[in-house]
Amino acid sequence: MSEISPKDSEMSATAKAEARGLFAVCIEYFAPRQRLKTAIPAVAHRVGITSPRRARAIYAGEARRIESYELDGLRAAAAKAEALRTAAQLDGAAHALLAIDADFHRPEIDRLRRLACELRGIADQKRPA
């Protein structure tokens, strides 16, 4: 008879908590105005979780275990969301400097735009679309 060691259940609880947090980050970025009932399956499809029921179980913390491919997909999607969010913030900062004094801040504006472009390129290389 095999028993679950405390270490296994602790790792499982950690994976569940991480998956739920990553799901929340992805929903916030990729489906911000959708109801959870539609946002969870939309994000799940994006990260490669094919079953809406499985996605809801992971989000609710009810899944018995989290597969590595599911966690990897969620991590990649969350990283992409963070990169795109940061790129948008850099663009906003460049736009603000442009409104203040475009000639004076030109080197900084160009640098911010270049960084934003690089971040978008990195985000496009992440697995989930």
Question: Where are the language model's segments positioned?
Answer:
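Short, charged amphipathic recognition helices of the HTH superfamily
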Residues: 28-46, 51-52
